[in-house]
Amino acid sequence: MKTSIATVSISGNFAEKLEAIAAAGFHGLEIFEQDFIAHDANPREVGEMIRAMGLEITIFQPFRDFEGLPDPLRAKAFDRAEHKFDLIQELGTDLMLICSSCHPEAIGGIDRAAADFHELGERAKKRGLRVGYEALAWGRHVNDHRDAWEIVRRADHENIGLILDSYHTLARKIDPDTIRRIPGDKIFFVHFADAPAIDMDLLYRSRHFRNMPGEGDLDMIGFTRAVMATGYSGPISLEIFNDQFRGGQPKTIAKDGYRSLLALMDDVHRAEPALALTVPDMPARIQAKGLSFIEFASKGQD
């Protein structure tokens, strides 16, 4: 199973990010358009640069505000998608993420969205590309992976699949076991991110307080078990938006992220050994037993 990390998860310029990701042991990365807008190279050169580091581009993202738009906005959305297809072909990857629309003029309706994605799937197929649909926790009409899956199911196109994100599912307190009913081959990509259990706007918490798996309060093991039970065999990828990480040392953050993914997969394997997981041999767990030292601190008249 391939490991991946979003470039936005770590600090540094683009070259520093690539070096850190490769050194940590990841197989690939999620690339954002901002990466090469700020980098002095065209998309084709960026793709070559990534592959020269022994990495692959696992997904290009994000493409926003696509589905459910009335004309002429709908026609413009398809034009935008075609331009993005040009871009990802130059990069040398085949998968693009579309997140659920937040556009104020987007119209709800499962069948309407499914029709949009079926047409987009036809366009993607002509280019040998795939499109994954992800439900944002704050999406205007679609904010639940169950609705996103129903749209993908009704779109009924081999080049259209579902993208899951642990934060978007668990932060909304959606039962992760609902994922088990989804065919694994229709899940194109999975993002992993933990977060603290704090009462905060979902968007703001996502953009500033995501954590590595195991560093927050979300049921990462339950989510991952559900995903793997579907037979999913695509990349496992970190997508961490965190202000401290963006200000930290790239290599340190990348290494911590890689270790967190391995630890999560090991936890899942121990919890449900029957799941088909490729996990490196890990040392036996050491359990703390009792206390050997306690230190107290006081100040002033305390």
Enumerate the language-model features and the residues they cover.
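Boundary/entry segment of secreted carbohydrate-active catalytic domains
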Residues: M1-F14, L291
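Structural preference for beta-strand elements that scaffold enzyme active sites
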Residues: K2-S4, G28-E30, G54-Q61, D94-L97, ...
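Conserved, mostly hydrophobic/aromatic
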Residues: I5, I21, L29, I50, ...
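Active-site beta-loop-alpha junctions enriched in small/polar residues
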Residues: A6-I10, F32-Q34, P62-D65, S101-H103, ...
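Acidic (Asp/Glu)-rich catalytic clusters
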Residues: L18-A23, A38-Q61, E82-G92, A115-K126, ...
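Acidic/histidine-rich catalytic cores of soluble enzymes
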Residues: G28-L29, E119-D217
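Core segments of cupin and vicinal oxygen chelate
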Residues: D35, E295-D302
